UniProtKB/Swiss-Prot annotation:
Disulfide linkage: C98-C108, C122-C142
Organism phylogeny: Eukaryota, Metazoa, Chordata, Craniata, Vertebrata
Note: Lacks critical consensus sites important for cysteine protease inhibition.
Lineage top rank: taxon: Eukaryota
One annotated GO biological process: antimicrobial humoral response
Keywords, sorted A to Z: Disulfide bond, Glycoprotein, Protease inhibitor, Secreted, Signal, Thiol protease inhibitor
Protein source organism: Homo sapiens (Human)
Subcellular location field: Secreted
Protein's recorded name: Cystatin-9-like
GO MF annotation list: cysteine-type endopeptidase inhibitor activity
């Protein structure tokens, strides 16, 4: 029995179509994984300096004699806006035993008290070009205590 001339070609075309879609799916998955990895690297590289700027700004604007330092990063994310990176973060800040104008507040112990006024939960939005050490505070909202 004679087969149709395109019958073998059709099965090859179908095979190529199926394999082609698998290759595209693998490429899309790899691209997504790479993008997630790049996003993680940017956060790991630039978030610490941005958090430091946020805490420094909080201390500069605070009327309290005592310095506050980072207790925990509660949440953070990054957005790209034109040529700037914008970090949004929710931080738990604790009052230390050191004055805010002392040299090494990073090593100051937290004040030990059950009073809520020893901590602040703050939401910061900071526009930055961290590779140029440029930071700009866009928003700061703080509430006393842990929320």
């Amino acid at each position: 029995m004679l087969g149709l001339p395109w019958k073998g070609g059709l099965s090859w075309a179908l095979l190529l179509l199926l394999l082609g879609s698998q290759i595209l799916l693998i490429y899309a998955w790899h691209f997504h994984e790479q993008r997630d990895c790049d996003e993680h690297n940017v956060m790991a590289r630039y978030l610490p300096a941005t958090v430091e700027f946020a805490v420094h700004t909080f201390n500069q604007q605070s009327k309290d004699y005592y310095a506050y330092r980072l207790g925990h990063i509660l949440n953070s994310w990054k957005e790209q806006v034109e040529s700037k990176t914008v970090f949004s973060m929710e931080l738990l800040l604790g009052r230390t035993r050191c004055g805010k104008f002392e040299d090494d507040i990073d090593n100051c112990h937290f004040q030990e008290s059950t009073e809520l006024n020893n901590t602040f939960t703050c939401f910061f939005t900071i526009s930055t070009r961290p590779w140029m050490t440029q930071f700009s505070l866009l928003n700061k909202t703080c509430l006393e205590g842990f929320h």
